[in-house]
Structures are given as structure tokens and as C-alpha cells.
Amino acid sequence: MANRFILNETSYHGAGAIRSIADEVRMRKLTKAFVCSDPDLLRFQVTQKVTAVLEEAGLAYEMYSDIKPNPTIENVQNGVKAFRDSGADYIIAIGGGSSMDTAKAVGIIIANPEHEDVRSLEGAVVTANPSVPIIAVPTTAGTAAEVTINYVITDVEKNRKFVCVDPHDIPVVAVVDPEMMASMPKGLTAATGMDALTHAIEGYITAGAWELSDMFHLKAIEIIARSLRGAVANTPEGREGMALGQYVAGMGFSNVGLGIVHSMAHPLGALYDTPHGVANAIILPTVMEYNAPATGEKYRDIAAAMGVKGTESMTQEEYRRAAVEAVRQLAADVGIPKDLRDIVKKEDIPFLAQSAYDDACRPGNPRETSVEDIAALYTSLL
């Protein structure tokens, strides 16, 4: 069987990378940007770091900021209308996963108007045309949406999130500039960083994993494990490490899939508006314990990448426990809650479990699971 791997056409990394945007726009002969960013980034003058580059180069743009932390169908619909009214021919997405996911959905619908209803794109729908060009500038070190082929939209009416997977949605250019992430508060840095670690660990053990994706995921775990505490403390080294680590994780998981940590996190975002990274971080150690019997020796590699010493001489039980505890300790060190008691209502568990089982990430889980298994996992976290 052939293994497919899809990455950005071009990516820029390092402090000051946003200054490369003007040259990319000129080279691609693009004329007007539809800048997709959330209101908080505008209020804190983060988005303006990029628009200043455009203004200095004399490049036209129009702003769109009708974006929520878990973007909705309405956000996408409004974005499609605003893009058509703007006269733009490309998108600059500035932000975390919410801005990126909104931009991807808008870009795909503009290029494929037969999918005017974004719900028609759920799953791995084959679209006829690539998205309008997207230049993605992440401001969080976690989602890696700038290098992935998927996006997640919330259906408010049905209290659910749905995943759309489409090679046509990947940004043509990713600009990963740690200076764009420096204003992230500690809590957001911790949550998005643990999201990145979840991508790397789930991607490493997912059913579709293979040698090339393994290489990216193990390196990502190593970089994130040594960088996240520093990033939360706002050190330059920590910020730079997380900017790279989350991108490397995205290079991997986008091409092989994830598992039930993400399946269980998605309904929490849809029902309670729980930040995605926080949900992943709380769930990850418990699901790692559940999945351990289906992972062979991979937890030995995870433990070593997390910085655990002496893994080569450990028994299977020891290195599996060490991997889980290293993840749990990192989450505690960066201030992640230990459980879901303040988030989940017990009476909602049947709905959450069914939603998680139906989620597009669930089939990638290395261990066969059921609605009942997932309900038990939620219950164990209360």
C-alpha cells in the first residue's frame, strides 16, 4: 500500500519570518489579501504585525474577524460572503486553530461553490479544486493547522464538532515566527503546547503510523518535552522550541491521523466550549493507559523522548508507566487540571461517548474501542 505525505509548498521558520510574506505575495502575483484573524489578536495588536508588513510593501488587504474560539458554521458562512464582497484573491490566516480552520473552510467553499454548506464537506470529501491560496501565520504553538490537511467546525444546533479532511485545504505558505507567539498568556501556552504533544503521541501510535511519520512524531515529542516548560515561562528558547515542535508534529499527524484523545476532546469543545488543548491535556494520560496494550514497544520510545532515563533496561510495564507519568507530570508542571470534574456533567456522558465514537479521529485509535469503553474513560476522569 502506498503512503501519502502532503506538506506546505513553502514554509518559513524563525524570528522575523513574517517579513518574508511580501516577497511571497509578489512572487505569486497575488493582489489583495483577505486577512482572517480573531478579535483578541486585533485588540492586542498581534494581527497588526502582519498587516504592517503588507502596508509597508503597498499590498492591499481587507480584515475579517468574525471568528469564535471554536469556529461555527455561521462564522464560515459570514466569511464566505465577506470574501466575495472584498475582491480578494488570497487569504492570510493569522491566529490559532480557529482562524486557520475558518480560513480553510472559506477558501475551499470559494473554490468549490457546490459545497456552499460547509456540512457537506464533513469527512474526507473529494473536492474538485484547491482552496484559494492561503498564507498561514500561527500565533499559538499547538494546533499546527498551518501544515495540516484538516479543519474542524462546530455545529451549534446539534452540539457537535465535525472534521473535514481535504488535501486541497493545506496552506500554500506557512510562516512560523516565534515572535508572533510571544504574547500568548501562560494558560494558552500550556494548553496549546499540550495539544501539540497530543498530536505527536497520538500520531506516533495511530493505526496509520509508518516509518516517515514516526520520525516526525518522535522528534516532536522530544522538542516539546524539553521546550514547553520554558515556553510557559516565556523564555525565547522555549518559544522557539515550541514553534518548531508543534509544526513537526503537524507534519506527521496530518498525514496519518490521530485517535480517541481527540475524539473525546471534540465533544467537550462543542458542548461546553472547553478549550481544545485543555481537553486533550486532561484526557491524554488516561487514554495512554487504556491504549498501552495495543502499542507494542512504542511507549519505550515515547518515554525516552520525554526525557526518561534508563528506558532501555525497563520492562514493558515499567516503560509504559514511565511514559504515562512523564506526560502527566509535564501537564501538572504547566498548570493543566487533573480531571474533568469542573467541565463534564455526568448525565451528558452517554451523548459525549456516542459523539466521540462517531468522530472522524476514532478509527485511527490503536486499540479497538466501543461507546461503552469511551463512556468509562469519561467517567474515570470525573
Sequence positions of predicted segments:
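Short glycine/serine/threonine-rich phosphate/pyrophosphate-binding segments
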Residues: 18-21, 43-46, 73-76, 99-103, ...
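An N-terminal, well-structured beta->alpha segment
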Residues: 1-64
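Catalytic phosphate/nucleotide-handling subdomain of diverse soluble enzymes
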Residues: 267-306
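Carboxylate- and glycine-rich phosphate/diphosphate-binding segment that chelates Mg2+/Mn2+
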Residues: 150-256
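Glycine/threonine-rich beta-strand-loop-alpha-helix active-site module
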Residues: 74-179
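N-terminal small/polar loop signature for handling phosphorylated ligands or for N-terminal nucleophile
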Residues: 42-115, 229-239
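C-terminal charged capping/lid subdomain of soluble metabolic enzymes
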Residues: 299, 309-382
